[in-house]
A protein has these predicted regions:
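C-terminal capping/gating helix-and-loop segments adjacent to ligand/active sites or protein-protein/ligand interfaces
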Residues: 51-52, 70-71, 133, 309, ...
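Extracytoplasmic/periplasmic substrate-recognition and gating elements
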Residues: 68, 287-350
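Hinge/lid segment of periplasmic solute-binding proteins
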Residues: 97-148, 163, 172, 198-199, ...
């Protein structure tokens, strides 16, 4: 064979190899490409409380089986989302309960403008105005309302032949009549900031919703303004006059400042107080106990009636969704279901009526709320101003009014001065540094990297062979960033995450892992792949079929787990789930239940804390 022929053969062979390589590459997805595809197909929803994870989230997923939704329990704190925004980790959909446009201002440019959407158009203008920025844009939409007003023992009124209040004057008369028979007419749990804040605003809801009131509120909440905004001199002086009058008429004293929720509930249950300020949920609770209870609104001194409301939470969407039409469409579908009547009915407490700010949700009031039907139909549901400043300053100033330290004029000046004062710098001591960001999207081949980091780190903190955690244990916020104490603490789910440690055999561990993966009676049942548990110290294989999950294998140190192995196991779960998950009493208890957040905080305070590396802990087939 001559050289020319040999070269031709070699060239043809090389071309064949290259061609096969190209074809093979087109037919096989790399692991990285698969993960990118999973990321693109996933819509992440951060929930403000774990309560929503158990009923609300599964319903939303059930209505959108073709959308992969990953629900993560975040924090009820806008500072948490500001931190995620600053470090490239803002989720697709955010929910927050403790909320104000004032505190949300730094997030505005990162959020979608929902003003022209059908979802925003369905909200009554009266309420939508509370969410409009000064430029007319709308970034946040409210779900249904938690109604606060006066919980009233009607049986006591009938027993002492005292007329039920119909206006402010008759409310005061009722308080005076009860005092004559040795019963408090009214009190509330004024040890809490929100009770102080809501009483102050509720008594002046009529004035705060006037044109002047809305003008001030818009200026106070304007995200474009960097100047601190105090109280106006048109609406607010009168608000403190009404608060002072209310304190005088109800005979509130410094002793009331020590009352907490349990104290007030006990007084009401024992017939020691006729009325208290609280949630409408109390009506059903006391009726179930045989106490004839009704709900009443605030009686404004101008004759109007108002209910104080706070949305159970507000929803916002990440503006980055607008860069991908398919992802935006999926997110809007999720938003639509989140705001639906059926979904919102899963938010409210047992026995509460669904009070929606949306015209798409019909008004159906039960016996518990029939006395305020006219108030609701008039759209007199006042949405509180709930900035961090208003919580803190209301607690300070209203408490001093109740204690007799401030007159109305002094209270107004003190409140205004505190709003205008420069903020005290936050404690920015760095307690943890993460050198890289980890994905918090669940991947079929490996699980969630950020959750794995937290599970592996906590396995070291607890000094345990194996750690099992429900998926809602972590907030997924492993970012390339420096963490101060507050943000580091927020890496753990905030709502009562407990730990329990035991020594188990391999056989007992298998059954425990099975309960975490497949669900168990009385416990949490995973409803999508993102809700599957997180494990450390072992790796698991899980089969997915028709929305249910089956444990098919466990390995430890690369080898199948043996039934006669002995291991220490630490389980993390919400308090109400722990008993069901460990109902078999598998193994021997080594440690009592502890709060994970406290253990994590103690670990960070010791200095030198570091995050572990992620591992592939789950294979989903």
């Amino acid at each position: 064979m001559n050289k020319r022929t040999l070269r031709r053969l070699l060239s043809a062979f090389a071309a064949l190899v290259i061609g096969l390589s190209v074809l093979t590459g087109c037919g096989t997805k790399t692991a990285e490409n698969v993960e990118k595809q999973e990321d693109a197909q996933t819509i992440q929803v951060y929930l403000w409380t774990n309560n929503l994870y158990e009923t609300y989230a599964p319903y939303i997923q059930s209505q959108l089986p073709d959308v992969n939704i990953e629900f993560i329990v975040g924090n009820n704190d806008l500072d948490f989302y500001k931190f995620l925004q600053e470090n490239g980790g803002l989720p697709d959909i955010i929910t927050s309960c403790r909320f104000s446009l004032h505190d949300a201002a730094p997030l505005k440019d990162s959020l979608m403008n929902l003003a022209l959407t059908n979802e925003a158009g369905a909200v009554y203008n009266t309420y939508l105005n509370s969410f409009k920025n000064e430029d007319g844009s709308v970034n946040w939409l409210p779900v249904c309302a938690d109604a606060h007003g006066f919980v009233v023992n009607r049986g006591l009124f009938e027993q002492y032949d005292i007329p039920l209040p119909t206006d402010y004057e008759s409310f005061v008369s009722a308080c005076q009549a009860f005092e004559k028979v040795g019963i408090r007419g009214f009190t509330a749990d004024y040890t809490y900031d929100y009770t102080c804040m809501e009483t102050l605003q509720g008594l002046s809801a009529a004035e705060l919703t006037t044109t002047d009131g809305r003008k001030w509120r818009t200026a106070y909440s304007d995200p474009a303004s960097t100047a601190r905004v105090g109280l106006d001199d048109t609406v607010w002086p009168g608000a403190f006059e009404r608060m002072a009058q209310f304190i005088q008429d109800t005979h509130l004293t410094a002793d009331d400042l020590a009352l907490n929720y349990d104290d007030v509930i006990g007084m009401f249950r024992n017939g020691e107080v006729a009325m208290y300020f609280g949630s409408s949920a109390g009506v059903k609770m006391f009726r179930d106990e045989g106490i004839d209870t009704i709900f009443m609104p605030f009686f404004s001194q101008n004759g109007e009636k108002w209910i104080m409301t706070t949305p159970y939470f507000q929803i916002a969407l990440n503006r980055d969704l607008e860069q991908d039409t398919a992802r935006r469409e999926k997110a809007m579908k999720v938003l639509n279901v989140m705001l639906s009547e059926e979904a919102q009915s899963r938010i409210i407490s047992d026995g509460q009526d669904l009070l929606s700010y949306s015209q798409n949700v019909p008004l159906r009031l039960t016996e518990c709320m029939k006395d305020v039907r006219d108030v609701v139909e008039e759209n007199h549901m006042y949405i509180r101003i709930a900035s961090n400043d208003f919580f803190a300053v209301s607690k300070d100033v209203v408490s001093k009014m109740i204690a007799g330290e401030y007159t109305a004029q002094q209270a107004y000046r003190a409140f205004n001065a505190q709003l205008l004062a420069e903020e005290t710098p936050a404690d920015d001591e760095i307690v943890l540094t993460s050198g890289k960001s980890c994905s918090n999207v669940f991947h079929a081949n490996g699980g969630s990297a950020s959750f794995s980091v937290m599970a592996n780190t906590l396995r070291g903190v607890y000094g345990t062979d194996v750690l099992l955690a429900t998926a809602n244990s972590f907030t997924g916020s492993v970012l390339q960033a420096d963490y101060n104490k507050k943000m580091a603490a927020s890496m753990i789910m905030p709502n009562g995450l407990m730990s329990r440690q035991r020594t188990m055999t391999g056989a007992e561990l298998k059954e425990t892992v099975r309960a975490f993966v497949e669900g168990c009676e009385g416990g949490f049942v995973p409803f999508n792949r993102g809700s599957l548990p997180v494990v450390s110290g072992i790796a698991v294989e899980v089969k997915e079929a028709g929305g249910s999950y089956t444990l098919t294998g466990i390995t430890r140190n690369g080898q199948p787990l043996r039934d006669d192995d002995t291991v220490t196991v630490t389980c993390l779960a919400a308090e109400n789930q722990m008993e069901a998950l460990l109902a078999s009493e598998s193994g021997r208890s080594l440690d009592g239940d502890t709060w994970v957040k406290n253990r994590w905080r103690d670990h960070l305070s010791g200095g030198g804390a570091a995050l572990a590396e992620p591992e592939n802990y789950m294979t989903l087939r």
